[in-house]
Amino acid sequence: MNKKTIWITGGSTGIGKALAIKFASKGWNVAISARRENLLKEISDNNENIHGFPLDVTDKLKCKEVFDQIKNKFQSVDICFFSTGTWNPKKEKDIDVEQIQDVFKVNFFGTLNSIKAVEEYFKNKKDGIITIVSSIAGYRGLPNSTGYGPSKSALNNLAESLYFDFKRY
């Protein structure tokens, strides 16, 4: 029987890293992606089941390229866990539109780029799981979260909308 494979974006820290270690301990092939190659290397060097694939999710073409590399390496992907995120806390007096746009580029559009990279694969396979990590900040305003909260709220809406689109597959 072939080992199962999971691809985790945001896999170098936080929830993504913890999940990578957990799945690897269960014998899964774990592909992790993040911008910081040194952290990917550190994690993969300490676990033979974890493999780093450097990625900036704001690059749509690179998302597809990395997913294709993962498919080629492991022959199949069973779960995609998209946990990429950035937070740039700001008080209302310090709100900078460009910084909020940068947060959206990573948190929302980076996740959307990742979904678009795997969409056809999972539709054709008719099997698999795509998980999007959000935050309580996506449901309720929190202090200093003028960019982060709205970007996660957009992810919540995206996930709910895609559920209806993808469930027929």
Residue spans for each PLM region:
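The beta1-alpha1 cofactor-binding region of Rossmann-like NAD(H)/NADP(H)-dependent oxidoreductases
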Residues: 55-65, 97
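Residue(s) in the substrate-gating loop at a strand-loop-helix junction
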Residues: 135
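Conserved glycine-rich Rossmann-like NAD(P)H-binding loop of the short-chain dehydrogenase/reductase
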Residues: 26-43
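Active-site helix of classical SDR
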Residues: 115, 151
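Substrate-binding pocket helix/loop in short-chain dehydrogenase/reductase
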Residues: 91-92, 96-104
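Active-site loop immediately N-terminal to the catalytic Tyr-X3-Lys motif
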Residues: 93, 140-146
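Conserved glycine-rich cofactor-binding loop
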Residues: 12-13
